Amino acid sequence: MKKSLHICLVFLLMMIYTHTGIAQATHPEPKTLEIGAKAPDFNLLGVDGKMYNLNSFNNSAVLVIIFSCNHCPTAQAYEDRIISLTNDYKSKGVAVVVISPNSVKALNLAELGYTDMGDSYEEMKLRAADKGFPFPYLFDGEQQKTALAYGPAATPHCFVFDKNRILCYCGRVDGAEKPGTGKGEDIRNAINSVLAGTAVKVPVTKVFGCSVKWSWKDEYTAKLYQQWAELPVTLEDIDVQGIKDLVKNPSSGKLRLINIWATWCGPCVTEFPDLVIIDRMYRGRPFEFITISADKQARKADVLNFLKKQQASNKNYIFNKEDVYQMIEAVDPEWQGALPYTLVVEPGGKIIYKKQDMINPANMKKLIVEDKSIGRYY
């Protein structure tokens, strides 16, 4: 018996050691490239559909590689400065390249509260078009080989290389995150020194921003989604006055997305998952998602069952009267009555959006994040 237990214990320890060894070998701790190091080559797809490597920039005296992304509020705060940097130094033989290092698998919806887009390749194309990026915007989120080779600590993180592609500067764009306060002083000083052939006075700085979303660090995402799945889903009755109060939004201090729907409405059911995603993106901000079911009270159990399947842990109501026209007038006298119907109401009652039909999820996210009560930056 003791011998059997000993054999089992040895086998268990071997399994733990083997698993740990494999994990460490597969997922090394990324190390930031050191000053004086040669630029590692890469082969990455740009949002323009072209492949890029170091040789793509052979004609440039200075190569600036910036690891950044769509979703991070700090990265977004620096977008315009990186655009200006690119335009200002293009004629001086400086090439700016931006690489998105993040794995989509490790990026969860709660981390998208300051953006309208995630970090997928398709969303990168949309952001580049929306902002008019004048630089190559490359995707490394699939294998993250380039990010591992360079070791960015956060987004954004800048690497400046001379004509021999030796690293001369590694660090921040500047020390003032808020748009309008900084002009990219740190990276501009570094580029100017490299162009002049002189040593960069401050070759390394710390960086501030969002951590890189490594593909193997997705435990928190799985845990968060499980927590969301376990949140209680409720359905309460609401009367005419209650609906009017919701639309007035007098004291919540939150931007309200109000959706009127029904279980028998095909478009309502079709768009509902997108509304849940939007709620999960922005529920950590001054935002709340509210649904009002136009189903009859006799179908209350069916409504709740649908909401539970959707994991709709937001505020959910069902109109408590038989006369649906009272509900229509309470929501919006201008509403014709067709479902779905969606409102976005600022704190204080200003309606900034209303639509009788399905929403466009991408447009809705942009509307929300660019509202004065939400915003893209800290």
What residue ranges belong to the model's regions?
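Conserved redox-active cysteine motifs that mediate thiol-disulfide chemistry
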Residues: 68-81, 260-277
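Short, internal strand/loop/helix patches
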Residues: 116-155, 159-160, 168, 304-339
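Thiol-/selenol-based redox modules, centered on thioredoxin-like
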Residues: 162-238, 339-378
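Short pre-active-site segment immediately N-terminal to redox-active cysteine/selenocysteine motifs
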Residues: 61-63, 68-71, 254-256, 261-264, ...
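Bacterial Sec-dependent N-terminal signal peptides
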Residues: 1-26
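Thiol-based oxidoreductase modules, predominantly thioredoxin-like and allied folds used
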Residues: 93-118, 133-143, 286-300, 312-323
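Short N-terminal segments immediately surrounding and downstream of signal-peptide cleavage
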Residues: 25-46
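A short beta-strand-turn-helix
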Residues: 42-63, 235-256, 276-281, 328
